[in-house]
Amino acid sequence: MSERTLFDKVWDAHTVRILPSGQTQLFIGLHLIHEVTSPQAFAMLRERHLPVLFPERTVATVDHIIPTDNRARPFADPLAEEMIQELERNCRQYGIRFYNSGSGRQGIVHVIAPEQGLTLPGMTIACGDSHTSTHGAFGAIAFGIGTSQVRDVLATQTLALSKLKVRRIEIHGKLGPGVYAKDVILHIIRKLGVKGGVGYAYEYGGSAIEAMSMEERMTLCNMSIEGGARCGYVNPDAVTFEYLRGREFAPQGSDWEEAVAWWKSLASDGNARYDDVVVFQAADIAPTVTWGITPGQGIGVDERIPAPEDLPESERELAKEAYAYMDLQPGDPIVGTPVDVCFIGSCTNGRLSDLREAAKIAKGRRVAPGVKAFVVPGSERVKQEAEQEGLREIFEAAGFEWRDPGCSMCLAMNPDRLVGRQISASSSNRNFKGRQGSPSGRTLLMSPAMVAAAAVSGKVVDVRTLL
C-alpha cells in the first residue's frame, strides 16, 4: 500500500483485530511502569488471579514520588516509602525488570528508556503517564494510559484504542540563537491551542525538525499532549539511527543493518495522506514563556501579555482567570517578571543537552539573591555524564542545588514544592493552578537556558542577551 503515514504503518503492524465496538485491539511492544499508577493495576491482577502475560516487555523504575534531595531509606514521606516498596514487591513477584535508585539506570521513565535503547522506531509503547508521547521522537507510537489500561497491558499486552487522525506540523528554516525545541513546542501549542490536537496524532517534520538532535525531538514530542494530541512523532532518519547505534538494548551486529532497513521503510510515504497540514516558519519563533495557567498561554519573551480583546472570544474568560491568578496585567511585559524558584529538569528538559545549555548561562554567574535554583538530572546516567563533564561544578559554583534524578517539581508529588504564592521559572511541561505543590503557586514555563537566565537575574530575561 502507498500513501501511508508512519502512524498508519505502525498501527497496522500491531493490529490484533478489530473489536465489535469498532476499536482496534493493538499489541503493545513496550510497557513502562512506575510507582504511582501501577499499584492499583497489580492489585486488580491479583483480584482476578491473572499473571503478567509478557513480563519481559515491561520495564519499571521509580520517578514520580521519590525524593531528589535525600535517598536514605526509609524515606521521610511514609507514602513514598510504601509506594516504592509496593513496586519493588510487584516486580519481584511478576518477574519484571526494575531499575531502582542506585542501580545506575534509575530515572524518569521517559528518559531512561531512550537512553538505554529500549525505545525503538516502529514500536508501540504505553505507560501510565501522559508524557509517554516523548518516545514518538524515535518514530514510535506511544500513548499515556490510565490505571485500568495499565492492568489491561499487564494482563493481555494489548489495548483497545480508536485510530487517530494525523496532522503534519512542519517547521521550516533555521532556529535562531537562544531558541530551542521547548520554544518550538510552546509556539505550536500557542498557535493551535491546548485542544487543537484532540483526536489527532501529530507528525512533526520540516527542515527545522530534521536539524534537531534526538533529545530536542524528545522535548518536542513530549509536549504533544499539552496541545491536545494523543501522541506525537518524528519519522526516523540518520539522526535517529546514529543515536541508537551501540545502545544496550538496540539491535547489534547483523541485526542492526536489518533493523535499520525496516526502520527506514516506516517513514511516511512521500505522497502520504494527512488529515491536516500546518506550516510554521522557524524565524517566527522566539524564546517563549507562558504567562497564564495553561501551556497555550505563552508569548515570545519580547512580547507583552495580551489583552482580552486581542484574543479569540473563546479564550477571553480563561485569560481573565489567568490574570487574576498569576497577578499579571494585560500589556505588562513578561520580561522583568520576578521569580522565586528556578527548576531545571523533568521528562521534558532533564537530559544532558538541556543541562549543557543551562550550564552555558550559569557559568561564571551567580544565582540572584533570594532565588532558590536547583537542577534535577533526568536519570542516574544523565547525572553521571553531567558530572564527568564538569556541569555539576558549574551549577554549584553558581549557587544551584544539584539533585538526584526524579520528576521533582514538575508535579511536586515529592518534597520539591512551591510555597504559598511563590512563582517559578520551570523547564517542565505544565503550568496549571497548583501544579508545583502549592495551591496558590505560579509557574512560568520556558527552556532550561531561559530558566538559568532567570535564576541569575532574579527575573525573566531574554536569554539571548546572555549568550
Curated annotation (Swiss-Prot):
What family does the Swiss-Prot or TrEMBL record give for this protein? Belongs to the aconitase/IPM isomerase family. LeuC type 1 subfamily.
Pathway where this protein functions: Amino-acid biosynthesis; L-leucine biosynthesis; L-leucine from 3-methyl-2-oxobutanoate: step 2/4
How does it associate, per the subunit comment? Heterodimer of LeuC and LeuD.
**EC number(s) from the headed UniProt entry:** 4.2.1.33
Q: Which Pfam families would you find in this protein's record?
A: Aconitase (PF00330)
Which HAMAP family does the entry link to?
A: LeuC_type1
State its cofactor.
[4Fe-4S] cluster
Main EC class of this protein?
lyase
Q: What is the lineage of its organism?
A: Bacteria, Bacillati, Cyanobacteriota, Cyanophyceae, Synechococcales
Recorded protein name is 3-isopropylmalate dehydratase large subunit
The note on cofactor binding and number reads: Binds 1 [4Fe-4S] cluster per subunit.
Q: What is the protein's known function?
A: Catalyzes the isomerization between 2-isopropylmalate and 3-isopropylmalate, via the formation of 2-isopropylmaleate.
Residues reported in the UniProt entry to bind [4Fe-4S] cluster: 347, 407, 410
The terms under GO molecular function for this entry are: 3-isopropylmalate dehydratase activity; 4 iron, 4 sulfur cluster binding; metal ion binding
Task: Tell me the keywords, alphabetical order.
Answer: 4Fe-4S, Amino-acid biosynthesis, Branched-chain amino acid biosynthesis, Iron, Iron-sulfur, Leucine biosynthesis, Lyase, Metal-binding
Catalyses which reaction(s): (2R,3S)-3-isopropylmalate = (2S)-2-isopropylmalate
